[in-house]
Amino acid sequence: MKRLFVLLTALFALTQMNAQEKKNIRISTDNTDLILQVAPNGRLYQTYLGDKLLNEQDINHFSYAVKGGSDGSVSTRGWEVYPGSGAEDYFEPAVAITHHDGNPSSIFRYVSSEQKAVTGGTETVIHLKDDQYPVEVTLFYIAYPKENVIKTWSEIKHNEKKPVTLWRYASTMLYFSDHSYYLTEFSSDWAKEAQMSSQQLQFGKKVIDTKLGSRAAMHTHPFFELGLEQPAQEAQGRVMLGTIGWTGNFQFTFEVDNVGNLRVIPAINPYASNYELKPNEVFTTPEFIFTLSNNGTGEASRNLHAWARNYQLKDGQGDRLTLLNNWENTYFKFNEELLAELMKEAKHLGVDMFLLDDGWFGNKYPRNDDHAGLGDWDAMKSKLPGGIPALVKSAKEAGVKFGIWIEPEMVNPKSELFETHPDWAITLPNRETYYYRNQLVLDLSNPKVQDFVFGVVDKILTENPEVAFFKWDCNSPITNVYSPYLKNKQGQLYIDHVRGIYKVLERIKEKYPNVPMMLCSGGGARCDYEALKYYTEFWCSDNTDPIERLFIQWGFSQIFPAKAMCAHVTSWNKKTSVKFRTDVASMCKLGFDLGLKELSADELAYCQEAVANWTRLKKVILDGDQYRLVSPYDGNHMSIMYASPDKNKAVLYTYDIHPRFGEKLLPVKLQGLDAKKMYKVKEINLMPNSKSDLAANEKTYSGDYLMKVGMNAFTTNQAFSRVIELTAE
């Protein structure tokens, strides 16, 4: 009996020791579990990422070890959460540090962790420390249960005798073990943003990155879709959507290893960015935001949309302003009288605001084209003798708000600013200067430049507190890559420049929290969730051809809610009707950029009614759940709908792009309705003196019928559109 007691005591002690050695950290939403484990060697590993487990005790069944391949040591390494370089891991590290003594290796061991409630979810903080050097890494995870979104980032700091050099600095590292992986990426160019393409990931690395600095996303966007076991699909299959909150150079690395596991590594692009980190200085990586779904990209997108409106997007719960912009109507050629007339047109159209675009500033070097004036943010006296105050007054008299365009991060060599402060621009010494759009990028790593850029906005709002909106542009990538301010620390330019932008935006947000701003970068070359903490919306593309916009807006909708996406009715592709152009813009945040005088009486009446309908239904469009029903990538038609959270109201958009002769037309099957409710169908946005030919118009159907059988809404007409309102009875 005594021997049995001793044996049981020993077994209990061993069990307790193993439980302590295998500490599990659970990061959970309502649908997803991310399980991390502290192994007996003191290091932190990912043991599970997938559907949420119902039984809390089940997380103890996981082991940090992975299946070995030809290299037996793989079985002991496991999926380390934040692996350093230079030790035993053969694959891409999360962090690479050269210590002050030249040692290039890092191994981090678990110190402690804590969890606390934060707005909308739970924050988990995990502290790691190198056991040979005074270097610490802190991992942050915020899980948003209802939205099924996890946000994660890291901090690196040290207390060595001298600075260390950071060569890699990932936000996180995530692992997947499936038979196959399919990546959807979003390529871009001017007027060709958010173009979707997919491929199967094979052994080795696939890297998506950018090296453009300020206009960073001009060629590729900072988000992706990952299909697990099958290509990502809209309404079925396991998918991950991920995006990094960084307005500069980013890098996504997808590495399939020798045993078929996948590492996903989101990070600042380390290209030309060997960062010198001083003792006790904190290096914070960007936030990586991701969501998982077993029901395709549609559900995953709705997760991100809801999360963004609730927690990330500036004024995500607030209203948005419809507007009339003057750019495509006047370009640089305008005066006070013409602008006053356009403000009256804005009121007549029914929009909330008139937005004055480029060309209003510069005196010694007037901004009459794109060769001069950037940096000199005083109203041009020859065009606008009354300055901004006169424009604000005219807008007020017309009954609309007034907004204005700025590009404060840029400078023309032909400007008083450049004459006074040539050292404020990013320019190479001893080299011929290369100009993009005849301009240079101001060096936002320089605190004096940060003060100047903040002062541009501050001066306008201090002198004109009734200015209601800013369109903030950024047309040039960083060229001539050299910072006069950083001198011998050029490896920090790409990073400190972006951080400088954030410092400016934080000051603006703190002093003017209620002023909405549109993010623009020669179109949609800036579109990330860190910038959108400071902007209410972004300009998707300079391409406003409605057919091209269907593809562009479809792509951006994978990640961003309609509330954040600006779409304007313009004169691009006049072969299409004003109705078609307006219906395409109406699926996002609506605006206009054309002169009313070029519209016929019927076209103007149509636009006025469309604005009124959009305003009446904007809560559904901007704050409802989005369902992408028919993809333009799959054929000659597209359909998208929005449903209110209570399922009492929905708005359906259908677009015929280039139907084939005799093409078979299938019903559009709706989603997001209440199967038991009855819905009255009504086609809206009709041209004057025309009637709907929609067979379902003015009829009532059950939500069940509309979702299972659908509605015959497509036609064989070229560039034809419908907007259909559904109301529960």
Enumerate the language-model features and the residues they cover.
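C-terminal beta-sandwich/jelly-roll accessory domains of carbohydrate-active enzymes
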Residues: 658-729
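Carbohydrate-binding surface patches
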Residues: 31, 224-226, 234, 631-675
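Bacterial Sec-dependent N-terminal signal peptides
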Residues: 1-22
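Active-site neighborhood of glycoside hydrolase catalytic domains
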Residues: 385-387, 419-421, 425-579, 589-594, ...
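Short Pro-Gly-centered flexible turn/kink motifs
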Residues: 103-108, 275-294, 719-726
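Glycine-rich, aromatic-flanked loop segments that form ligand/cofactor-binding clefts
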Residues: 86-108, 231, 236-249, 291-313, ...
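Aromatic-lined carbohydrate-binding/catalytic grooves of carbohydrate-active enzymes
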Residues: 315-455, 464, 469
